[in-house]
Amino acid sequence: MAPAVLQKPGVIKDPSIAALFSNKDPEQRYQDLREIGHGSFGAVYFAYDKKNEQTVAIKKMNFSGKQAVEKWNDILKEVSFLNTVVHPHIVDYKACFLKDTTCWLVMEYCIGSAADIVDVLRKGMREVEIAAICSQTLDALRYLHSLKRIHRDIKAGNILLSDHAIVKLADFGSASLVDPAQTFIGTPFFMAPEVILAMDEGHYTDRADIWSLGITCIELAERRPPLFSMNAMSALYHIAQNDPPTLSPIDTSEQPEWSLEFVQFIDKCLRKPAEERMSAEECFRHPFIQRSRPSDTIQELIQRTKNMVLELDNFQYKKMRKLMYLDETEGKEGSEGNGASDDLDFHGNEANSIGRAGDSASSRSASLTSFRSMQSSGGAGLLVSTNTTGAMDNVHGSSGYGNGSSSTTSSARRRPPIPSQMLSSTSTSGVGTMPSHGSVGASITAIAVNPTPSPSEPIPTSQPTSKSESSSILETAHDDPLDTSIRAPVKDLHMPHRAVKERIATLQNHKFATLRSQRIINQEQEEYTKENNMYEQMSKYKHLRQAHHKELQQFEERCALDREQLRVKMDRELEQLTTTYSKEKMRVRCSQNNELDKRKKDIEDGEKKMKKTKNSQNQQQMKLYSAQQLKEYKYNKEAQKTRLRSLNMPRSTYENAMKEVKADLNRVKDARENDFDEKLRAELEDEIVRYRRQQLSNLHQLEEQLDDEDVNVQERQMDTRHGLLSKQHEMTRDLEIQHLNELHAMKKRHLETQHEAESASQNEYTQRQQDELRKKHAMQSRQQPRDLKIQEAQIRKQYRQVVKTQTRQFKLYLTQMVQVVPKDEQKELTSRLKQDQMQKVALLASQYESQIKKMVQDKTVKLESWQEDEQRVLSEKLEKELEELIAYQKKTRATLEEQIKKERTALEERIGTRRAMLEQKIIEEREQMGEMRRLKKEQIRDRHSQERHRLENHFVRTGSTSRSSGGIAPGVGNSSSIQMAM
């Protein structure tokens, strides 16, 4: 379930997301909240669930402030993630509450983490213990990776342990809901190279968790991850550009060599190319994980850690009781000098013991623990991680105290004795923890860790004890407060007796067990409150990288939107152009058809008009010809009549002869008229044939002209469309180049900002280290005069003792010499011996003065030499880290330039390919247009030839028919000969 995009953090409109949260008051359900750790989002608390009667861990996450939206989205992601995953080796999700601007994420309570164990025990784990923890962790990772999820923050601080020796994977605030991912997130020392370079080189997969697991194995084996002596920011650069880390060489006299399976397991987990690493399933099947081991390995490890925590807390309690008792006794005696000496002696022993452990190791261990807690999101709420400074101070302080008391006997003898009942009570196995100085001032309750029962006894659960057990515990607490496993805070010592008993019963009922001492928790809080530390720097750096990634995503979305808008615009332009051209084609073709129809109609009308005119002319000529023939007929008839009359023929014969003459004349007249009519008809037909041929030729020319115009229109439209496509290609090219330039400018700006942040962080780290070293040297310089005075006093004391011894010896020697010399020489001898004695004492004084000067000079030179060596080592270390940073920045800058060059080349190739394809398409369409023009012309020529052939055939058939029929009227049945031909 992806986080919803909300207008205001804390306001939920999606019912599916609202179902994840409860608006009830969590303070009414959970009681006895006590802080047990700090995370990057807030604090983690132990609490008691009154409804379900069980102990839980509550992670309070505030989502107010400048980054409220980002915090709220992260909360939604983590809550949604935990609500969807269920696995025996993943911390159980209980509930989630919203109270004002704080989210209460309730999960199962675990007693500590794997990091707590190595910090408390102050040594690495054995292989069998590492394998047991990794086996259950890999089981959880297999489940996550099968869901295409990436944890992205695997480390010992996020591998929790329950009181039943079950490993629980926690802290999903950095988890990714998709695989692959592309976000810079995680703890620096455990981040895979591809995660560090996520924004520069692309995405990463679930193999990033395998790298973190390999680093975690080294952490469990060596107490701290590789490169931990470096600045956290410098570690990022080192991981990104150097070879993978390996196990450090070990002293075989103290522990056995690492097995080949373990070395190979880490080697396969820490392959720099992600594809060469094992998957979670392959890791789980590795011989190192699958080899046999005792079933109670983790339980025994937890028990040893609990015992150590108990000893450390008891030591803190003893130290506080002794300091309080000594202050009271020295105040009564009023011996200010002795009190100062005793206090100096006590703290001096402690300081010496801690100094033997090594200041650098202690401070680095403290930073490791605090860094673990700060980088985690408070996972499971459970013990986020451990600060080892308290553990180291406690252990060394304990051993140092014993040694110190034997080495400073004179000081110890001046101390008043500590009552035996106090020593006996504080050494009882059931004694609980006592808060350190900070915890007393803050009135924080510290609860002891109850020893884990033996295998024969049932494993304690988080269920409350019975009433009988509670009553017996109350009685014990009332009878002997120092012999209980629970100790009330200082402020509770003044509570009413009944209230104290109720509080003790409540605390006993909750069974608060942890693998961390109270001093560790207090120091973790102090580390968290420091300003400008590496945690804040890393947080700012992560936010910067994530902000850059978010800005890039938004830019890519905007570019995609611009490209889509341009595509829609170009498609719309093409569609509009196509529609316009289709309409234009239809209009042109309609106009051409109309013109053809008009021309055909004009041809028909012209033919009809010509026929009508010609017929009228023929009729007129026929009338004239008939009249002429009639005149000729009359003339011939009169001539014949005159001729016959001249013959004086009988009337009947005359009449018969006249009839024959008239008949002959009529036949001649009719024959001539018929011939003339045939002539006129032939002339008309010839005229019609000429007209039709001429009009058909004109019509064909018109059709060819119109067809050429149609092809020209199509060609013009094609050229216009090609111009539009070229313009759109240029628009697309300009937009892509603009986007690429903006992207490159943004990446360069991001890189410069990132480099500035990295350089500023390195400078701050350098300044902080130099300031700390200067403070340390200043402290040593301020401490040196007191140390020199003490040693000078010791030398002078030795001098006085030697002088006293020599004086006694001189007196004895003088007495002996006086007794053996005469009395008159005694005075002279005494004077000479006294003079010799004075010279010896003066020489001895000179020697002691020289010894003091030499001691002061040696100490000063030695201190200065130490300080110079420390300054030189620190300068070399910081210079090396700065060089690595510069090299890393040069590499990233070169990588970016190479990437920019590749992207520009790729874009130019894409643009060139598109341009070539467009030009090829234009050429092909033009060739198709030319081919279409040629084919159309051929088709028109063929059609016109066929039409002319049909017309001639029609003329032939019509002419033969007319001649055969003879009596058909002119023009009848021939008016549609052109249409028939077409």
Swiss-Prot record:
Q: GO biological process: what's one of them?
A: neuron projection morphogenesis
Segments for region (Disordered)? 331-484, 592-620, 751-789, 957-982
Kindly state which keywords UniProt assigns to this record, in alphabetical order: ATP-binding, Cytoplasm, Cytoskeleton, Kinase, Magnesium, Metal-binding, Nucleotide-binding, Serine/threonine-protein kinase, Transferase
Q: What is its main location?
A: cytoplasm
Question: Which residues of this protein are catalytic?
Answer: 153
Record's subcellular location: Cytoplasm, Cytoskeleton; Cytoplasm, Cell cortex
UniProt feature, compositional bias: Basic and acidic residues: 595-608
Q: Mind telling me which SUPFAM superfamilies this protein's record contains?
A: Protein kinase-like (PK-like)
Q: Name one GO molecular function term.
A: protein serine/threonine kinase activity
- Null mutant phenotype: RNAi-mediated knockdown leads to embryonic lethality. Increased and prolonged cortical contractility leading to a more persistent pseudocleavage in surviving embryos. Decrease in rho-1 anterior cortex localization and increase in posterior cortex localization, leading to a loss of asymmetric rho-1 cortex localization during early embryonic cell division. Increased cortical nmy-2 network between the foci, suggesting that the enhanced contractions are due to increased actomyosin contractility.
Q: Which domain of life is it from?
A: Eukaryota
The EC designation for this entry is 2.7.11.1
Tissue specificity remark:
Expressed in the pharynx, including the pharyngeal muscle of the metacorpus, the isthmus, and the terminal bulb; in the intestine, including the pharyngeointestinal valve between the pharynx and the intestine, a structure near the anus likely to be the anal sphincter and the excretory cell and in several ring neurons.
Query: Where do Low complexity bias regions lie?
Result: 353-373, 459-472, 957-967
Q: Name one GO cellular component term.
A: cytoplasm
- Domain called Protein kinase: residue spans: 30-289
Binding site residues for ATP: 36-44, 59
Q: Where is the composition biased (Polar residues)?
A: 421-431, 759-768, 973-982
Family membership noted in the UniProt record = Belongs to the protein kinase superfamily. Ser/Thr protein kinase family. STE20 subfamily.
**Protein name listed in UniProt:** Serine/threonine-protein kinase SULU
Name its species. Caenorhabditis elegans
